[in-house]
Amino acid sequence: MQETDDLLKTLNVKSLLEALLVYTPKGYKDLSLLERFETGLSGVLEVGILEKKNYAKVLKIFAYSKRFYKNLELVFFNHSAFYYNQFKTGESLFIYGKLEQSSFNQAYIINTPKILTEFGKISLIFKKVKNHKKIQENLQKLLSLENLKKEGVKENVARLLLEIFFPTPHFVKDFETNKNFPSQHLNALKYIEMLFYMKNLERKKLQFNAKIACPNNSERLKAFIASLPFKLTRDQQNAIKEIQSDLTSPIACKRLIIGDVGCGKTMVILASMVLAYPNKTLLMAPTSILAKQLYHEALKFLPPYFEVELLLGGSHKKRSNHLFEKITHVVIGTQALLFDKRDLNEFALVITDEQHRFGTKQRYQLEKMASSKGNKPHSLQFSATPIPRTLALAKSAFVKTTMIREIPYPKEIETLVLHKREFKIVMEKISEEIAKNHQVIVVYPLVNKSEKIPYLSLSEGASFWQKRFKNIYTTSGQDKNKEEVIEEFRELGSILLATTLIEVGISLPRLSVIVILAPERLGLATLHQLRGRVSRNGLKGYCFLCTIQEENERLEKFADELDGFKIAELDLQYRKSGDLLQGGKQSGNSFEYIDLARDENIIAEVKQDFLKNASVSQGTFEN
């Protein structure tokens, strides 16, 4: 056990699976003696040195193969004296290289061969590491059928992995011919990559006692739902039912609720507050605008006996002094909640809205502040960014996840992909909509001019709109007063010029047109969020994707689809999966081998095997 730990430490990894994924060979060097003298083959030859000649920048060593009795030339370009002195006339050496034939004189040649002191083995070639030999030794000490089985790898997959890390000459030849691993070996790497992912999820899953087990509150919930001026969708009702079960449990729940744009998750949030009553609920939103929206929705729809308070950064001291008195049932705020020193002991439920906008540490800090003596509050995390079905499949054994797919009323949004020469269509529609007292957002790809991007920036484009329309507002992520600008625009503006900061959650009831410049630079999930700003209250909506590209299949497919979950699947096909394990990056690929768009069968197989071998219960997430 100690030897294994020492080897893992030397490799700078924490588990055998991680070692296999970090140090998967990117190629092989077969140091076996060549079986035949044939151009195109790489391997080891024993050669006798006949003579050496220096031609300006080229050193030629004339030699012969002792096994095959063939003459050949060893060629070094831009050589140093070191190479010249390595080869002594009359001596024999073992060299490694690729046998080729000169197009000039048909002589057999090896360019820049390597002199060997030992041979007969197959060396693994790793990416971006220095001591290949030592890494190979340590890996091969760790690797065995027994150790792989201990990690939960089934035997047929384990044997394929052993072939990758203990390769035969035949395996190396196949690898070099195909420039990759055979398909069954690639599937073995996919298997352990998903197994490693699931083990990481399982490691985070910890159970804690709930600080407060809430009452059933069925009658109170029924009265709340009956008071609403609209009917809840089936998905909303199912989500509320799952949350009700969570909140009455003595185990602190942590549930992720994922809803499409406009699915009505605010009503699920308010129903959760009703279910927690008379205990207190704390809700954290990423911006003041969203916090205020939720506050006003709570005042509008929660029963009259609820006392709801709002805490924002810079709130007046006198007003915030009574926020946490016993009479308050719901506190809604921004990250200002994290810096408030009051006792949160009476809060049974902590809700994070647009949870992907917060870092793990921020979410954990809020939960920790509301914990008491090792007992935790119930925690609900809401997100309006649908995830692919395959990722949901992988997560579902470890994270309590609820999907809200149904939309209370179908949105009527027309999406058009337009070239800049067709911008007249956009201008005509903007004029029409402003005449109806509707609003428009124009999204620019960047704030200031850039030589690298062939589009106008926000600062360059502002004058174009200001000359043609009234009531123009401009803001960006760099604007310290952006929330005030957006709030004023909501009441008084016609056109808002902005960057993608308006992507999530902002409610603009009169907004009917969004114009997105350089849409090819954005992921489909971001485009879907931006488009989701229009048609919030039943207005006919228009989304114009204005590009300089003549054709873009990805944008055309997006234009034909309004379902956020289907767009999440589509997004996988056109971009790498993103850092889905950590929840941070939005591009790049956290999975090197698994393709979330195509490998559902492997994911299902790993999940089935893992649950069979591990004691996995529906617990909660630490982070």
Swiss-Prot record:
SUPFAM superfamilies the UniProt entry points to: P-loop containing nucleoside triphosphate hydrolases (SSF52540)
Matching Pfam families: DEAD, Helicase_C
Gene expressing this chain: recG
Protein's name according to its UniProt entry: ATP-dependent DNA helicase RecG
Subunit organization: Monomer.
Binding positions for ATP per the UniProt entry: 259-266
Purpose: Plays a critical role in recombination and DNA repair. Helps process Holliday junction intermediates to mature products by catalyzing branch migration. Has replication fork regression activity, unwinds stalled or blocked replication forks to make a HJ that can be resolved. Has a DNA unwinding activity characteristic of a DNA helicase with 3'-5' polarity.
Enzyme class: isomerase
